[in-house]
Amino acid sequence: MALDYVKVLNAQKKTFSVIGRGEASAAKFKEQTGIAPYVGGINKYLENNTLQPDTKFIIATGTEVLMPVLREVVAAGAGRVLIEKPAAVSIAELLENEQYLKNLADKIFVAYNRRFYSSVIEAQKMIKEDGGLQSMHFEFTEWAHIIGPLEKAPGVKENWFFANSTHVVDLAFYLAGSPTDWRSFSKHGTIDWHEKTNFAGAGITDTGVLFSYISNWESAGRWGIELLTAKRRIYLRPMEGLSVQVKGTVAVNEHEFDNQIDKDFKPGLYKQVEAFLTQPESLLNLSDHIDKSREIYQKML
């Protein structure tokens, strides 16, 4: 992710520094970007540098060290922080740090970049044109046969729903509103690295949108969101694309829209960074992320 952020920051003509840990990774980073990172990690950097009140940090470390780095950065007085999702290795770790971060939550933002996909912005425009969203269905199936063999830090795969699937869940309820009256179901599967593998649920959101979801990590499937208005069904599947089924027809056709920025950069990242630097209120702040984790993600599990 650090390489993707550098590409965006360079394109936006921003002045920035990069903090790395090891010599080998720093040398590789310099070879790829032409930028020499500060070596030694965040602790060493903060020991030798004083942060200005308007200093902005982007934390793009491995999932397992997101929270420790965040604690160091806010303790040192960072003015604003964008931290990669989901800001902690587990929901438990996030909630354990709630009190420590509570008074700082309005300046910490979680990088759910799919909110800024060109496809999502286009879908929002279409929903508004049609008079609003009526119902929604989403799926966050993960390919367990691919994820299982991956070598990850302890705790990452065990919390894969939180670390990865919440990309879909966050976006779904960002578009439809927060669930209010709803039920969720989940069950164990045969994989040994994640407690639950089969999920379903349904209900209504605070904006009156009916919703349902399903996910079976040991069957076929993929990420996707279906958005139903009075005039059409909008498909975000894949989520970078957009397809439409018009009311009274059975054909599902690709919808053309301007997504060049998501071809030039990692999808959603350019607009996300732009928002972080200029209009952070459009991002998910840490306080809301904590609430979602407690009230939605834990219930889905």
Predicted features, each with a name:
Residues 163-241, 268-280:
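Contiguous beta-strand/loop segments that form the cofactor/metal-binding neighborhood of enzyme cores
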Residues 46-51, 88-148:
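A contiguous active-site-proximal alpha/beta segment in oxidoreductase catalytic domains
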Residues 19, 31-34, 48, 52-61, ...:
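C-terminal helix-rich "cap/oligomerization" subdomain common to oxidoreductases
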Residues 1-35:
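N-terminal Rossmann-like dinucleotide-binding module
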Residues 82-84, 108-110, 236:
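Hydrophobic residues in well-ordered beta-strands that form the structural core
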Residues 111-115, 127-149, 160, 164-168, ...:
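NAD(P)-dependent dehydrogenases' Rossmann-like dinucleotide-binding region
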Residues 5, 33-100:
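Beta-loop-alpha module in the N-terminal Rossmann-like domain of NAD(P)-dependent dehydrogenases
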Residues 230-291, 301:
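C-terminal glycine/acidic-rich active-site capping loop/insertion
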